Amino acid sequence: MLDVTHTTTALLQGLHSDGGNAAWEVLDRRYRPIVTGLARRLGLSEQDAMDVAQDTMVRVLAEYRDGRYDRSRGRMRSWLLSIARTKIADVYRKRAVRREARGESAMVTIPNEQELEDIWSTERRLVVLREALAELQATSKTADRSIRAFEMLIFHRRSVGDVASALDMSENDVYLAKSRVARKLRDTVKQLESCYEEDAP
């Protein structure tokens, strides 16, 4: 069953109560995949992206518990991005040292703040959509093939023709499946978006 009771504000407050373990698990489950996706989009390998996400989330918890995050001075997304950007830059620096040792160029450019915000927003939308799709699979009688068609189109960016061929469907049926699944996901996505809203008061 979908849990939409924990806003980011409530989770942050929960980090201070009863050791904050339950709140931390939800916060980590919510933001770790976004940080991993961000790191992947910036060219890190799957393992490096997972390491960056791990290091980022550990740092977030430590800084928050040390009182170093002040919500009145900035959005949580900006704080998370700042930590993630530093961790990603560390990986690039290590790579640059190895490149220089081999006599190769060590120049690396990390996107500016607006580009990072845009990537973050895209990754957050994908995480929310995946969570909503998992909820739909668990709680509805939507055909598995329709859900698979939606996944292939949206997450794997396959063409309608490819999806139709892979799933033994007509192209028209693929379009209809995508439309049906998207319609069913709309309300769940809206609920989840409110939970992921870092800027809520």
What residue ranges belong to the model's regions?
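Short, basic/polar amphipathic helix motif occurring as a linker/hinge flanking DNA-binding modules
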Residues: V91-E113, S194-A200
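Conserved RNAP core-binding helix
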Residues: T5-L12, D28, T36, E46-D66, ...
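Structural recognition of an alpha-helix C-terminal capping motif at a helix-to-coil junction
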Residues: D51-V58, G74-T86
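A short, charge-rich alpha-helical start-of-domain segment used by transcription regulators
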Residues: S17-G37
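Sigma70-family region 2
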Residues: H16-S17, R41-L44, D55-R73, K94-A96
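DNA-recognition helix of helix-turn-helix
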Residues: A89, V160-Q191
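Short amphipathic alpha helix immediately N-terminal
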Residues: D28, E135-D162
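Short, aromatic/basic-enriched loop-to-helix "N-cap" motif that marks the start
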Residues: Y64-S82, E100, E171, L176
